Amino acid sequence: AGVNGTTPSVALQTRIDAAERYLKAHPDIPAVLSGGQGPGEDISEARAMYDALTDRGIDPERLILEEQSANTRQNLQNSLALLPDDYHKTVAIVTNDFHMGRVRLLLNAAGPGRVVQVPAKLPWWWLSANYYLRESFAVVNDQVVRPLLA
């Protein structure tokens, strides 16, 4: 997703928006904000999310920062290691919708129980509505429906 200086990229901003909605709807859960600091970034992705969410009224006591990861696999491994044991039964993942499939595959290997998907949608007009619709149904079917019916 990335940070431009200290400003979240469009992709990261959509994740922040989705995380805010989810956290406000579920006020008793903690959140691990995961993402390291890349080249050209003045702060880590995790810090950018923390700053934005606390500015929007999310209690900082609920937010756990994971600022060491450099890729999706590390994001997941490091984040799961920071969660209290009882939260491994259900994990909610907030990421961009286009990224959700790969995240789910990595999570299956990591072993948490139930995974709640919280997709963040990009606002870019040039993305094909047909492609998004088809992919959305495929991801829901493969990653949510089939495991629930198994």
What residue spans do the PLM features occupy?
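A transmembrane-helix-recognition feature enriched in membrane-embedded lipid enzymes
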Residues: 128-150
